């Protein structure tokens, strides 16, 4: 697996980002000279430095003095001093998706797209192909617990990639197997309308070559409608839907382990294959659906059933996806990246099925624009939580929007019938608030894409300091 040699030093602007860090790591492991910069230290920056990659903190024109190629993500503004310097020097400037596409060009690729579930599904596909001795290269949008990283370089002919639709660049990725988990209104700052979001996913599937196939979840009505619009490409449908080609059956959500089976049917509706006794060591029907997508791909690529069953049973999950951070007095605390109403509802439903006590949701809304555009959905996605604690919005660089803040969300939840909603002043008050609500057997789920992950890891210790266990 090689790009042209002699590229010189490849500089990543924002190398600590989850998408950029994975590409940088794979290029480094291929033997290329890689360096980069980021605004702050982070776990990803530390990991890259431990690999021997030079990372500068802060953006400055001098950082690209020794660069021969500059890679940028869509988050990098045109006036970034490193981008300005690169263009002044007439250096090649490559978008993140273009560099990813260049890596993908050298392998057969499975690309996982969808508004939710991409990262977990990508990890599951990687685990199943690994179990089938495919030794895939993987670039994911989250840290895979089994690898301790979001990227790995494999010796096999296949590559598994999370396809980020947020800026439309997923349409540049050369894909032989496309997975679409769901399609919801999101990233409207780029697409402007939901119709354009759906059109982009249609193009994503139609870009698959004639010898490839798409795996699409028809439990989701928008995806089912999309299936009906796609011509001249092979589509394998999956879901609990009785019409699915690969059907999720016999789901049992008790005890934090998801037990299920998968039935494969031909176009005449006849069962041609069945895998039963699957056990996924994480809660939630949404995770069983993600696993079904991965199983559909693995089965199509001839991974044996016993390897599929073993890989699902040993699946280690993804960091920040229902990740247990600790326990205090019988209260278990979890960290989850969920920041869209559909994701939040799915996580809380899983928690409700797994918990023997109450479910306490602590949410840090991510971006004013998302809260504003999906306000009604946010007001109704916490039904499976006995208590909701709402923190101030994590701005992510945005300016406030009237009516889209913590207090309006608290009012909205109460107006929509929620019985227990508390406004949180800040993380320093979290232990006191949760300590007043939680009892042994309860689950506390910290939700959001911002700084709340740190709160989730600190909370068990803060609770212990505040209220020693009985």
Curated annotation (Swiss-Prot):
Q: At the top level of its lineage, which domain of life is listed?
A: Bacteria
Record-listed E.C. numbers: 6.3.2.8
> Where mainly found?
cytoplasm
Look at the named UniProt entry and state the broad enzyme category this protein falls under.
ligase
Q: InterPro entries under this entry? A: Mur-like_cat_sf, Mur_ligase_C, Mur_ligase_C_dom_sf, Mur_ligase_cen, Mur_ligase_N, MurCDEF_pg_biosynth, UDP-N-AcMur_Ala_ligase_MurC
Q: Name one GO biological process term.
A: peptidoglycan biosynthetic process
What does the UniProt entry say about where the protein is found? Cytoplasm
Residues involved in ATP binding: 114-120
The terms describing its cellular component in GO are: cytoplasm
Instruction: Kindly indicate whether the keyword NADP belongs to this entry.
Output: no
The record, for SUPFAM superfamilies, names: MurCD N-terminal domain, MurD-like peptide ligases, catalytic domain, MurD-like peptide ligases, peptide-binding domain
Per the record, the pathway is: Cell wall biogenesis; peptidoglycan biosynthesis
MF-aspect GO terms: ATP binding; UDP-N-acetylmuramate-L-alanine ligase activity
Give the family per the record.
Answer: Belongs to the MurCDEF family.
What role does this protein play?
Cell wall formation.
Tell me what this protein is called: UDP-N-acetylmuramate--L-alanine ligase
Q: Which organism is it from?
A: Xanthobacter autotrophicus (strain ATCC BAA-1158 / Py2)
Name of the gene encoding the protein in the UniProt record = murC
